[in-house]
Amino acid sequence: MARRDSGTSKEEGRRDEHVIEAIGRTRVVIRDGRVAEVGTPCIADCPLARKFAMPVSEFTPEAIRANIENRIRSFGMCTGRREVTDTRDFVGFGASELLSSALRAGLIDAVVLACDGAGTVIAPTPALVQGIGGRMSGLVSTSPIPEVIERIKASGGYVLDPDGASIDQVRGTGAAYDLGYRQVAVTVADAASAREVRALHPDAVIVAVHTTGLSRDEAETMVSCADLVTTCASRHLRDLAGSALIQAGTGIPVFGFTRAGKEIILAKVRESKAPVVVKFERLPVAGTGPEPLV
């Protein structure tokens, strides 16, 4: 999950620095493998955070720091030890879980997403999509880590900017088509990128992620441009969900606003062995979600 930004290479003097927004959209800075800064969360509670490998039930700086440090230890986030492939589902209808399933079903043939230490990446395999995205929070900016970039390449991925690790989902989508992929999905975290991708690549599957705090105008743009929208703690996206074709989950629902988005959610349901409830209902259907919505 990534917010559009540009990276600067270490060769140009930048330190090993990575900025993410995690656990209530708290700004966290990681330098040289250590948590250097922890900001203030935008919300007070989230049901997803209580299901993390290291659960966070109270959004304090200490708890958030401990969770991020656990990610660094467990899978090398923002370090040269970063694991980039995985086959486990971490949540039922997460963006990476849905897109990995869509790859297996043949609905798409590549995913454009962002990875700490690499920036924008084109991933053609379910394991690479899940390994990069399954435990990644909102990536604001990153710097290149050669070991991570080489690991992604060895796993069949393509790194858009290996020298700078910039995050540019619009350019990444174009690069995916240039590489010969024809059914491209892309994750976007800002409305401007969603609008630009839709204008340049009408057939791309757009997945809106990291949406907490979107303005009303931004939310309207996401709904009009994206095929799939993860609502996070966005009040405006929930208000606009009545036009969706399908909803997955209730606490942090994911909405499909197009037939392509609906098919991706249904593909995930088809391959899952978990029991499901299917019901015709006016959307959205609310559950116990993040607090407060913003």
Task: Give the predicted meaning of each segment.
Residues A2-V294:
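Conserved mixed alpha/beta catalytic, RNA-binding, or beta-rich assembly cores of soluble enzyme
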